[in-house]
C-alpha cells in the first residue's frame, strides 16, 4: 500500500459541524497547511449536488479544497438538467433518512420541489462562502495524474489551455465516474454484471411549459378518484392515462404520466418524456437524444393542450440542457452493494448513510413500462462502496459508485450521493490527519467509528437498525434471491413476488429462457410450456434441459433429484402431475436449474 510521506501536518482540533443556514462561511475550522508539493489537500471533480456536498464537507473540515466543474453552473442534474422534483429517501413511517448537508439544501430551497435558479445560487454560495474552497467552473477534466496506482492530481482544460492541479486526496463526483475509470479503477457498464451490457435504459429530457392553470390542475388531480395522483401548491403527479395514450412520431420515444413542479416565475418543469437508444457514454448520442426529444416536443405540446386538463393554453418555454441519465458505469469497489442489501434492509458496520428508495429499473427500447424490483424500508451505504479497487487516494460518490446494476436502481438517487459526498469530505480529513489511506480505513473499525461520530455531530442520521421483511420467511425465498439477482423477478412497491399464485405460461417460459441465457450456455429455447402450466409439463421441460433421460413423470423427477434441481422441500410443496405449480415451486426449480448450468 503506497503512502505519501508527510512533511508538515497540523492535526485538526475539531471537525466543523454542518449547521449553517443558507451555506454561509463556516469560521469554526482550523487552518491546515497542505502536504509539501501539493496544490490542494482535496480535489473534487464534478459539480453536481454530490460534488458540492463533498467540497463543502472537505472545506469545513479544514482542508484546502478545489472543486472542478466543466459546465457554467453548479447543480448538474438538479439545475442544468432541471430535475427539480427530489427523489426523497423516506422510510415507511415517512421519516427523511438523509440528513446533514442534504437537509441544509432541502430547507433552503423549500422542500421536495424547488426553483432551479434558487438551487443554482444555493450551490454556488455553498462553495464560494467556504474560505477553504476554490471553485473552477467551465473547467474540463482531461486525465488523471498518476504515481503508479496512486492518483495525485488531475489535468484539466480551462480558458483554452491545459493546467495541472495536484492534491493528496481526490474525490470523483462525476456522474459517470470518469476520473476513476481513467485512473484504472475496474467497472462494469449498464447491466453488464447480469449479462446486459448493451442495454440502454431510457433517459429523460425535462421540458418547461408556461401558461398552466394550476388551480385546474390541482382540482382535477385531487378529485379524479385515483389514489396514485395528486397535487400540492408546488407539485403535481398524474395524467398517466393521457401520457401513455400519446402516439410518438419517433418510435424511440415514450410519453408517460407527468411529474410536474412549479417555478417561481409560474412556469412548470415536466418529467415525463422517455428517450430510448441513447448511449450514456457517447456525447454524440446524448446530443442526438436531446435534438430528437426537442423535435418530438413539437407534437407533444399540441397533444397536451388538447388532452391535459389545466394545460389548455400552454407553450413550450424551453428544455433542460442536460439529459436525466440513470445509468452508465458501475465502479467496482471494496464492496459492491447488492440488491439483497437493498431489499433485505441490511445495516452495514461501516455505514456512511442510511437511505431508502424503490429499486426502479427504467424501460429500454421496446418496453412500455419499467420494473420495480422491490421497495426497502431503509438500508445502509457502506464506506467500502465508495473506495474503488486498484486506485489509491480516491473516493467515488454518486450513481456510479460501487453498486451492482440492480442495487443502483435504488442507490442512484441524488440524496444518496449527497450523503456520500458529505462523508467523503469527513473521511478525507480523517485520512490526512491520521496518515491512513482510504483503503486501510475501509478495514479499520476504529477509523470508521471516528468518521461516523463526526458525521453524527454534523447532523447525519446513522443509527443502527434492524428491519425484517415477511417475504424473507417464505420457504422459496432462496430461489427468489437467485432469480431476482438476475433482474428477472420483481416484487413491485409492495414486495409481492406472487409466490403462492399459479405459475403462468409466459412468466415461466421467459424466466427459464432468460435465466439460462445469462449462464452463457448453449440450450434449446423453451417454447412448449403448456397453458395452463402443469407440474408434469414443467418437470418434463426441466428434465430435457438437464439431460435427464426418462419418459415418465416419476423417472424425470428422480433424475432431477439426482442433479439437485428438484429437492425434497420442493416435492413437499408440489401437487400432482396434472395440477398447476405455484410460482414458489417453479421459481425454486428455475433457480436450481440456473445453478446447475453455471456449474457445468
Place the predicted regions along the sequence by residue.
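Beta1/beta-strand and adjacent pyrophosphate-binding region of the FAD-binding site
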Residues: 36-48
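Bacterial N-terminal signal peptides that target proteins for export
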Residues: 1-10
Amino acid at each position: 500500500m503506497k503512502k505519501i510521506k508527510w512533511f508538515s501536518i497540523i492535526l485538526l482540533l475539531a471537525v466543523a459541524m454542518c449547521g449553517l443556514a443558507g451555506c454561509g462561511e463556516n469560521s469554526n475550522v482550523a487552518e491546515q497547511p497542505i502536504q509539501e508539493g501539493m496544490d490542494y489537500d482535496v480535489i473534487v471533480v464534478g459539480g453536481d449536488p454530490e460534488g458540492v456536498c463533498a467540497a463543502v464537507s472537505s472545506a469545513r473540515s479544514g482542508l484546502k479544497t478545489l472543486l472542478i466543474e466543466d459546465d457554467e453552473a453548479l447543480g448538474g442534474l438538479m439545475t442544468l438538467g432541471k430535475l427539480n422534483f427530489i427523489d426523497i429517501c423516506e422510510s415507511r413511517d415517512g421519516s427523511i433518512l438523509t440528513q446533514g448537508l442534504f437537509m441544509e439544501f432541502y430547507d433552503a430551497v423549500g422542500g421536495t420541489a424547488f426553483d432551479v435558479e434558487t438551487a443554482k445560487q444555493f450551490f454556488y454560495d455553498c462553495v464560494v462562502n467556504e474560505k477553504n474552497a476554490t471553485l473552477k467552473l467551465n473547467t474540463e477534466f482531461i486525465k488523471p495524474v498518476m504515481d503508479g496506482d496512486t492518483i495525485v492530481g488531475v489535468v484539466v482544460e480551462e480558458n483554452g489551455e491545459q493546467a495541472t492541479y495536484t492534491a493528496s486526496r481526490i474525490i470523483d463526483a462525476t456522474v459517470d465516474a470518469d476520473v476513476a475509470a481513467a485512473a484504472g479503477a475496474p467497472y462494469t457498464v449498464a447491466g453488464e454484471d447480469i449479462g446486459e451490457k448493451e442495454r440502454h435504459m431510457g433517459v429523460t429530457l425535462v421540458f418547461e411549459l408556461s401558461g398552466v392553470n394550476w388551480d385546474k390542475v390541482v382540482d382535477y388531480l385531487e378529485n379524479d378518484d385515483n389514489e396514485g395522483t395528486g397535487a400540492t401548491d408546488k407539485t403535481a403527479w398524474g395524467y398517466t392515462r393521457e401520457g401513455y395514450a400519446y402516439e410518438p412520431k419517433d418510435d424511440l420515444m415514450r410519453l408517460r404520466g407527468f411529474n410536474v413542479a412549479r417555478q417561481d416565475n409560474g412556469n412548470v418543469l415536466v418529467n415525463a418524456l422517455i428517450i430510448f437508444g441513447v448511449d450514456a457514454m457517447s456525447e454524440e448520442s446524448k446530443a442526438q437524444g436531446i435534438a430528437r426529444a426537442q423535435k418530438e416536443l413539437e407534437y407533444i405540446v399540441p397533444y397536451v393542450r388538447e388532452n391535459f386538463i389545466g394545460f389548455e393554453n400552454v407553450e413550450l418555454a424551453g428544455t433542460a440542457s442536460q439529459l436525466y441519465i440513470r445509468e452508465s458505469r458501475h465502479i467496482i469497489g471494496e464492496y459492491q452493494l447488492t440488491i439483497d442489501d437493498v431489499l433485505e434492509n441490511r445495516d452495514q458496520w461501516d455505514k456512511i448513510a442510511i437511505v431508502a428508495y424503490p429499486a426502479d429499473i427504467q424501460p429500454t427500447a421496446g418496453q412500455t413500462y419499467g420494473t420495480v424490483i422491490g421497495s426497502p424500508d431503509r438500508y445502509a451505504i457502506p464506506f467500502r462502496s465508495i473506495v474503488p479497487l486498484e486506485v489509491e487516494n480516491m473516493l467515488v460518490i454518486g450513481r456510479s459508485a460501487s453498486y451492482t446494476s440492480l442495487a443502483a436502481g435504488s442507490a442512484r438517487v441524488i440524496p444518496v450521493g449527497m450523503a456520500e459526498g458529505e462523508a467523503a469530505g469527513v473521511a478525507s480529513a480523517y485520512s490526512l490527519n491520521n496518515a491512513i489511506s482510504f483503503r486501510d480505513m475501509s478495514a479499520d473499525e476504529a477509523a470508521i467509528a471516528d468518521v461516523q461520530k463526526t458525521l453524527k455531530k454534523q447532523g447525519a442520521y446513522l443509527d443502527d437498525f434492524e428491519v425484517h421483511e415477511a417475504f424473507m420467511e417464505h420457504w422459496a425465498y432462496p430461489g427468489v434471491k437467485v432469480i431476482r439477482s438476475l433482474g428477472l423477478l420483481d416484487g413491485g412497491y409492495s414486495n409481492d413476488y406472487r409466490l403462492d399464485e399459479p405459475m403462468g405460461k409466459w412468466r415461466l417460459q421467459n424466466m427459464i429462457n432468460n435465466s439460462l441465457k445469462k449462464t452463457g450456455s448453449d440450450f434449446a429455447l423453451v417454447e412448449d410450456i403448456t397453458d395452463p402450466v402443469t407440474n408434469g409439463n414443467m418437470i418434463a421441460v426441466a428434465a430435457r434441459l438437464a439431460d435427464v433421460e426418462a419418459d415418465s413423470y416419476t423417472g424425470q423427477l428422480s433424475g432431477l433429484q439426482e442433479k439437485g434441481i428438484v429437492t425434497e422441500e420442493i416435492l413437499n410443496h408440489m401437487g400432482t402431475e396434472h395440477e398447476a405449480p405455484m410460482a414458489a415451486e417453479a421459481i425454486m426449480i428455475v433457480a436450481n436449474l440456473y445453478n446447475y448450468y453455471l456449474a457445468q
